[in-house]
Amino acid sequence: MKDSSFLWYDKPASVWTQALPIGNGTLGGMIYGKVEEETVSLNHDELWTGHPKNTIRPGSLEAFQKARALALDGKLRESQDIIESDFMSTWSQAYLPLGDLVLTFDGSDRKSDYIRSLDLDTAIASVSYRQGKRIMRRELFASHPDKVIAVRLICENGKFDVTASLKCQLHHKVKSQSGLLVMSGEVPSEHNTNGQSDKQSYSKVDSERGMLFTCA
């Protein structure tokens, strides 16, 4: 296991930056590896506030040419003022987390021989440990051809119960549909940032509907 192609740890992650990453270029997941409750923090590369729009400011080319001429003339402050007032595009929107897949297992959190690892050759993340006679193992990976994150649960010398749930910080609802757990929701239509002062103010504007999303 202690091979250079593995990342491995002897305890679960306690914060997001310690979790193991998997992804396929579109879907991503961060795996914490707790014994009694596995959390996979999900994201999607297109889940942003706002909606498609042209961010190029009208007259920006002329403003750039004027600012460049002022800079070449040594008038740097005037050049900077024009860049800030007439050249810069609108503020970008906010990238959002999709939510959490939570797997709750039966039994206690007592364990031995715990290993949490990521195989850098196969991109498979795994969690394994012993609970009495049971040997528990989870394998997770993100498939690019199938566009899914897959979870495989294995138990040797026994059996187990698991409950799956989906959580999200956005406006959403979760329902069971055709054997699937489906989460659907809506992101804010705008995320405005006022960067003109030392203390930035943030507001959500929902005059237009934001992006709709579904996760199953």
Give residue spans per PLM region:
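Aromatic-residue-lined binding/catalytic grooves and analogous aromatic/hydrophobic interfacial grooves
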Residues: 1-216
